[in-house]
Amino acid sequence: MKFALLALAAVALASPVTLDERQIAIPENELRTGPCEPITFIFARASTEPGLLGISTGPGVCNGLKLARPFKVACQGVGPAYTADLASNFLPQGTTQVAIDEATDLFKLAASKCPDTQIVAGGYSQGTAVMHGAIRNLPDNVKNLIRGVVLFGDTRNKQDGGRIPNFPTDRTKIYCALGDLVCEGTLVITAAHFTYTVNVPGAVAFLLSKL
């Protein structure tokens, strides 16, 4: 069954996510406010998700990384300039330039504040557009620090040829569920768009394999 895009807010908050996956209390601003860690995870949440990491794939991947590498991971969500509002999905880049700039600044902050860190990143839904827009234009010295990127329900998948432009495909993992039409270049939201928590363990394993 297809849902109108404007129904995304209600459905997103009702999507099936367990309490453990939500990790509501998990830190999400550690790059800005905490010490440097060997691994820095930067994530852009889906439209309507609260906080900086959201309540689904973002905290799930963050928690998975922290469990695998205790006391070695800093998690950072994109925001508050990135508001994850619905209307921004209709813009030419699939999000706002303000959001892209904020993500760009976070990657640059990780590189300048923590030059020895290994960066991994991700995005879900509109957050994938944020990552496409930011990573493609990063200077090489920053881009080279990004070891892996995971994208869930990629709204730029078709437009950008199944990859992040100007970034190695072997460091990118795009998850597009069967029947998720946003991966086909539309903004038609189906139930498949809310199934990506099942891909969190695989995404964590992919990122760890790149470190």
Swiss-Prot record:
Subcellular location: Secreted
Secretion signal, residue range per the UniProt entry: 1-14
Name assigned to this protein: Probable cutinase 1
Recorded GO MF terms: cutinase activity
Known catalytic reactions: cutin + H2O = cutin monomers
UniProt similarity note: Belongs to the cutinase family.
Primary role: Catalyzes the hydrolysis of complex carboxylic polyesters found in the cell wall of plants. Degrades cutin, a macromolecule that forms the structure of the plant cuticle.
Keyword annotations of the record: Disulfide bond, Hydrolase, Secreted, Serine esterase, Signal
Annotated InterPro entries: AB_hydrolase_fold, Cutinase/axe, CUTINASE_1, CUTINASE_2, Cutinase_monf
PANTHER family with a match to the protein in the record: CUTINASE 1-RELATED, CUTINASE 2-RELATED
Record-listed E.C. numbers: 3.1.1.74
Any one biological process term the GO annotation gives: carbohydrate catabolic process
Disulfide bonds: C36-C114, C62-C75, C176-C183
Keyword Secreted: yes
A Gene Ontology cellular-component term: extracellular region
Active-site annotation: S125, D180, H193
Alphabetized Pfam families for the sequence: Cutinase
Site positions (Transition state stabilizer): S47, Q126
Top-level division of the source organism's lineage: Eukaryota
Broad class of enzyme this protein falls into: hydrolase
